[in-house]
Regions:
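Short cytoplasmic-facing helical segments at TM-TM junctions of multi-pass membrane proteins
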Residues: 147-189, 213, 217
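C-terminal transmembrane helix and the adjacent membrane-cytosol boundary/short C-terminal tail
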Residues: 96, 153, 184, 230-263
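Transmembrane alpha-helices
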Residues: 134, 138, 170-204, 231, ...
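Periplasmic/extracellular loop-to-transmembrane helix junction in inner-membrane transport proteins
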Residues: 9-11, 35-79
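Generic hydrophobic transmembrane alpha-helix motif, especially the helices
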Residues: 107-143, 150-151
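Glycine-rich helix-loop "coupling/hinge" segments at transmembrane-helix boundaries
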Residues: 123-124, 199-236, 255-263
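Transmembrane-helix boundary motif in ABC transporter permease subunits
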Residues: 76-106
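Transmembrane alpha-helical segments of polytopic membrane transport and secretion proteins
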Residues: 1-24, 245-263
C-alpha cells in the first residue's frame, strides 16, 4: 500500500518539475566540485564555462565552424553506416551462410576501440574529412548491424509460420511481417548509432581535422583551457540529448501500436 502511495505521489509531480530539480542538483554539485581543490581544475566555475561561448564563438570565431564540421562528419558517417548496416543485418538474419561468414568478423571489429584503427583508416583514406567519415561510418555500421540483427531473429516465429500458411512469399513476408515487427529495433539502432557517432568524434577528428568539436576538445585540453574545453563537452552532450528527444518523438509516432510500459 505504501509503495502504491509513493508511486502516485511521484506521478503527480509534472515532468518539468523533475527536470528543474535535476538541473538544480547538477548546478549545486558543480558548485561544490568547482570549489574543491582536488576537482576544481576539471570543473571550472559555471560562469567561466558560459563565458567560453563568447570566447570561442565571438572572439575567436571557432565555435560554429566546429559545430558544422562535426555535424557534417557525424551526419554523413551515420547515414552511410545505416544504409550499409540495415541490409547486412537483414541478410545475416535471413540467410544462415551470410550470418556464419559475417557475424564473427562483425563481433571481432566491434570490440576494437575506434581509436585503434584510426591509423589504418588514415593510411587508406588519407588525412581529413574522408577519414573522419569512414571512422564514424564503421562504428555506426557495427552498432546498427548488431541491433537490427537481434530484432529480426527475435520476430515471433508464430507470425512467420502463419504468413507462410496464408501463402506469403519472401517479399510479402518481409514487407508485411518482418519489417513492421523489426521497426522498434531499427529505431533503437538509430538512437544507438547516433550516440556511437558522437562518442567516436574525438577518435575520428584525430585524423588531422582542422575544425570540429572533437578536435577542439583535444586541442583545448592540450593548452589547459579547461572552461572552453568543458563548454565543448557540454555542447556534445546537448546535441546528443536533442537527437534522443527527436528520435523518441518519431518512435512514439511510428510504434504507437506497441504496448508501452511506464517504469
Amino acid at each position: 500500500m505504501n509503495k502504491e502511495k509513493k508511486v502516485d505521489i511521484v506521478g503527480k509531480i509534472p515532468k518539468w518539475a523533475w527536470l528543474c530539480l535535476s538541473l538544480l542538483s547538477a548546478v549545486v554539485l558543480w558548485f561544490f566540485l568547482s570549489k574543491n581543490p582536488t576537482t576544481s581544475l576539471s570543473f571550472p566555475p559555471l560562469p567561466e564555462v558560459f563565458k567560453a561561448y563568447h570566447t570561442m564563438a565571438v572572439e575567436r570565431g571557432k565555435f560554429w565552424p566546429d559545430v558544422l564540421a562535426s555535424m557534417r562528419s557525424v551526419g554523413i558517417g551515420f547515414v552511410l553506416g545505416f544504409l550499409f548496416g540495415v541490409p547486412v543485418a537483414f541478410l545475416m538474419a535471413w540467410y544462415r551462410p551470410v550470418r556464419f561468414i559475417l557475424e564473427p568478423w562483425i563481433q571481432f571489429v566491434r570490440n576494437i576501440p575506434p581509436l585503434a584503427y584510426v591509423p589504418l583508416v588514415v593510411l587508406a583514406a588519407g588525412v581529413g574529412a574522408k577519414a573522419q567519415i569512414v571512422v564514424i561510418c564503421i562504428a555506426t555500421f557495427l552498432t546498427i548491424t548488431v541491433t537490427v540483427f537481434q530484432g529480426v531473429i527475435n520476430v515471433d516465429e508464430t507470425l512467420i509460420k502463419a504468413a507462410r500458411v496464408l501463402g506469403a512469399n519472401d517479399t510479402v513476408l518481409f514487407v508485411k511481417v518482418i519489417f513492421p515487427a523489426t521497426t522498434p529495433f531499427i529505431i533503437t539502432a538509430v538512437r544507438l548509432g547516433i550516440s556511437v557517432a558522437l562518442t567516436t568524434l574525438i577518435a575520428a577528428e584525430s585524423t588531422g581535422a582542422v575544425a570540429g568539436l572533437g578536435m577542439r576538445i583535444k586541442a583545448l585540453s592540450q593548452v589547459f583551457e579547461n572552461a572552453e574545453m568543458m563548454f565543448y563537452i557540454i555542447v556534445v552532450g546537448v546535441i546528443g540529448m536533442l537527437a534522443e528527444k527527436i528520435l523518441k518523438f518519431f518512435e512514439r509516432r511510428l510504434t504507437s501500436w506497441q504496448e508501452k510500459r511506464e517504469i
